[in-house]
Amino acid sequence: MNFTEFALNNNVAEAINDLGYTTATPIQEKAIPSLIDGKDLVGCAQTGTGKTAAFAIPIINHIHRIVGAGKKRKQIRTIILSPTRELAIQIAENFEALSKYTQIKTYVIYGGVNMEPQIKALKYGIDVLVATPGRFLDLYKQNYIKTDALHQLVIDEADLMLDMGFINDVRKIIKLTPPNRQTLMFSATMPMGVRELADEFLSNAVYVSVDPDSSTGANITQKTYLVEKEDKKKLLKHVLETQDLKNVLLFTRTKQGADNVVDFLQKEGYKADAIHGDKSQAARLQILEDFKNKQIDILVATDVASRGIDIQQLPFVINYDIPNIPEIYIHRIGRTGRAGEEGLALSFVGRDEKTYWHDIEKLIRLQVKVVKDNPFPWREPNPNAKKDLRNKNKSAATGNSNKKNSTQNSASRKSDASKKNKKRWY
């Protein structure tokens, strides 16, 4: 579907054209008409499907129709809640690009930085506020955020909100907004907590979804190493040394895992650092900048922290931990091999991650090449180990049986003696 078919305002259409957008993505094609009609909407779509533009375009079109080209004092018309600072910044940048031919003012607020510039911007007046839940509530309590003129509330990455423990803050924020608002909720997955939130706060919502992209870039070489969990660090060192990998983005499942890998790499003499939710905003931005400037060779990241990161010309991705959601694998390795560049994605599959890996290969419809030149492969189970274990269990069972019989015999003897020496009470 072409964007010209949406009957958008000329100012919005011109910005879309400048960005090189001509044909709507599936989520945009399904969501934009309903949003233009003012309906509540729940969208199930992965990051990278064009979902930000799917809600940004109709929102900008709506606000521009209301405020026009005037420069009168601004009021918050739209609030977008985002779970992470990086995603919030990315959303704000998209809004600015799509509204550049309008008078719409977008501003982003998040924690970990000085409040004063944010307070100043809110006092001056804005149309679109992008915020992380915690900082929103902080500034609302101080009376710097007004929701009286609110038309739309967007909850982005709702499943991440749930995972990161923000869902109660989101509930509080929703209750601070006018009941006649238009509410939009987007999520990569639909766990029970997200569905309950939608049922509670959305009215006659339209549900749209797009199937996750199961394809990986043609110019990304994928390889896998079958490695025991306890050998992953040794394998990582081997791979880095033998393949001379630099400018590597390495993924772990947890923050603790990320810090653990960084400690190991630094002790081995590598320039490595991690980004995750426990790092301050200033620290994360500085680490990213150092990585982009090649001052850090290996950037270790969790999936949550990595959402919203845009790194151009990234040659290598390592899946140190295999994700338990197959679509995350596609998102991870999609960071490399962009803009015609070649990319390499290596995955360290532990024995306990076999099921995850099977699901990934099923999704991408590809059996990824297993590297044979691997000094730390899965160890073959010892055939005598099970036999020894069975014999041990058998011996233990026999011993217990003998002990039981001995106890029973003893009890029986005692009973016979009692019959002779003790009077019955009856």
Which residues are covered by each model-predicted region?
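Conserved helicase RecA-like core
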Residues: 2-379
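Basic Arg/Gly/Lys-rich low-complexity intrinsically disordered segments
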Residues: 69-71, 293, 361-426
